[in-house]
Amino acid sequence: MYETRESLGSIRFCLGKEDGRMNLAARKHSPPNLRNGILAAVIAAFALAPVALCAQADCLACHGDATATDATGHSIAVDGQKFGASIHGSLQCTNCHADIKGYPHPDKIAPVDCKTCHADQAAALKNSVHADSKDHPCTSCHGNAHEIFPKTDARSAVYPLNVPKTCGQCHSNGGMAGKHGLPSVYPNYIDSIHGFALSKEGLLVAANCQSCHGSHNILSHTNPQSPTYKSNIPKTCGTCHAKIEADYEQGVHGKAVAGGNLKAPVCSDCHTAHAILQPTEAEFRMQSTPICGSCHKDKFSTYRDTFHSQLGSLGGYVETARCWDCHGAHDVRPASDPSSPINQANLIATCGRCHAGANASFVKYQPHANARDRKLSPALYYIRLFMNLLLAGVLIFFMIHTILWVIRSRYNQVKSKAANGGKNA
């Protein structure tokens, strides 16, 4: 409990304007007993208060001056209008600056401890990747401490449309990213389908940084509790893409991940995490096959031998069939599954999407025929073996023929020279 004399000093700080005396409107016109009662009540209230709750106007008498600076030249100005409109506008200055008990106050005051009110957020932050960052106080994300607005207010630094720019202060090329080795993801995000929807179209439902990473409790992607941990990514993306998540869970990839196989692909393996393109874009279609090939190397190799691949890679024809045009995208199923587009019963319909008039003979074509695999393609395997043996036999035959021809030619030259008495013919 603070001493009465300290509380009295606080009364002068809060209510005194010139010489510390109370300036009550009824001072001259109230009966003495009433004035004394009011004074006693005020003194009692402040005597019991641990910290003087001073009116904002008293602080703004100095800090409301836009040119106000401290001894180091750092601005200590506070915009009274903006502060009044902020989420903290109803608070008194000393609610946050609790070590100030009177005026004049020390030049150096204690840093504001936000967890006094925001204990849950502080606890979450303590366990996050930002916990050890000395350069990451609350104001790094929420903005000027005296101008913090609700996240639903367009003026807020954490309003959905503003979040990428706020995070980009650190996670962009140079600056904090270069200094601390942070991922520089802002440039990729802002050009992605999510970034375009947010920044160009103003869609509040488009995914921003918080949508995937969280806010105060941001965990490393290597932490199993993180929403960006590999096995959690389908659920995270499914927050918006519910149908796609359901399809993915029914496919071979989703079942593999659910079974603990973290080598199986999740959303970010195919779409990337931040530079997500519209699937209909030419760039995405051109990139999609090598992405599948990074896991399915044998199938990618045989695909590259096909007309589909050569038309796309050499001819630059974007609309040629890619892996997902035949196998599906999210609910990829084995050929043995009756619902798979590459099941024998569905091949005519699958091929018919591009090849009108496709029939039973047409779908006998083997898109992944492998002449090196005797079990998969026995006819091709033996044809290739025969052609290789034929080629080798022809080369060996003519190599022997050439060597014998050279020997015979040399022999004839020597014989002819001997017949002419040592002279060349």
Question: Model segments located where?
Answer:
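N-terminal secretory signal peptides that target proteins for export/translocation
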Residues: M1-R35
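A generic alpha-helix propensity feature with a strong bias for hydrophobic helices
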Residues: I11-F13, P32-G37, L53, I109, ...
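Short sequence/structural segments immediately N-terminal
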Residues: L24, P50-A425
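Bacterial N-terminal signal peptides
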Residues: G37-V51
